[in-house]
């Protein structure tokens, strides 16, 4: 399996090639979409992309953790975490891609 990472530039280049917008407009479109998604997540909203998946923010409560080296109990503060749940279609596509 290759270790390729898709970047913003890759996404805007794909929009440029496949949609036909200028490179500048393609980059602006990608930035705008990512900004809208980020803003919604900061507000605690879910971002659902059909046939792809759902991004959401979960609140995790405070708890007591343990230092694995010393065994000492350590308090873990409450926090918000970002989660992604892929759609069934995305799960199937990824699983089918693994069959070589």
Curated annotation (Swiss-Prot):
Listed InterPro entries: Hist_DNA-bd, Histone-like_DNA-bd_CS, IHF-like_DNA-bd_dom_sf, IHF_alpha
Disulfide pairs? none
Q: Which organism is it from?
A: Ruegeria sp. (strain TM1040) (Silicibacter sp.)
Of the GO CC terms on this record, one is: cytosol
Q: What is the lineage of its organism?
A: Bacteria, Pseudomonadati, Pseudomonadota, Alphaproteobacteria, Rhodobacterales
Say which family it is in: Belongs to the bacterial histone-like protein family.
Give the Gene Ontology MF terms in alphabetical order: DNA binding; structural constituent of chromatin
> Pfam families from the entry?
Bac_DNA_binding
Source superkingdom: Bacteria
Subunit info here reads:
Heterodimer of an alpha and a beta chain.
- Set out the biological process GO terms recorded for this chain's protein: DNA recombination; positive regulation of metabolic process; regulation of DNA-templated transcription; regulation of translation
Keyword tags: DNA recombination, DNA-binding, Transcription, Transcription regulation, Translation regulation
Q: What is this protein called?
A: Integration host factor subunit alpha
Record function comment: This protein is one of the two subunits of integration host factor, a specific DNA-binding protein that functions in genetic recombination as well as in transcriptional and translational control.
Known PROSITE patterns for this protein? HISTONE_LIKE
